[in-house]
Amino acid sequence: MNKLYIIEEVLYDYTPGMAVICASSLDRCREIFLEEFDWDCEIEEFDESIKQSMFKVIEGVNHAEGIVSYVYGGG
C-alpha cells in the first residue's frame, strides 16, 4: 500500500500552497512532485518543506500513486 504525503509551505504565490501526493516513499513522492512541478523555486520549496518537517504522512492508503490534489498559494 502507498502512503499519502500532505506537504505544506509549497507552491508559493504570495502565500504558501500545499500538495497531496500518494507514493510508496518520500523519495518517490519527491520524484512525482518534480514530474509535475519542475521550476527550480518549486523544487527548492519542496526540499525546504521536507527539511523543516512541514508535511504529514498517512500510511496504508489504498490509492493509486501520483498527485492527488494541490493548491497554489495566493494573495
Segments from the language model and where they lie:
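A short, structured loop/turn motif at beta-sheet edges
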Residues: 1, 23-32
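Residues in flexible loops and secondary-structure boundaries
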Residues: 15, 29-31, 66
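Short aromatic-glycine-(Arg/Gly/Cys) micro-motifs in beta-strand/loop hairpins
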Residues: 1-16
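Short, mixed-charge low-complexity intrinsically disordered segments
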Residues: 35-75
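A short, exposed loop/beta-hairpin motif centered on an aromatic-Gly-Thr core
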Residues: 15-24
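A structural detector for beta-sheet-dominated domains
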Residues: 8, 24, 58-59
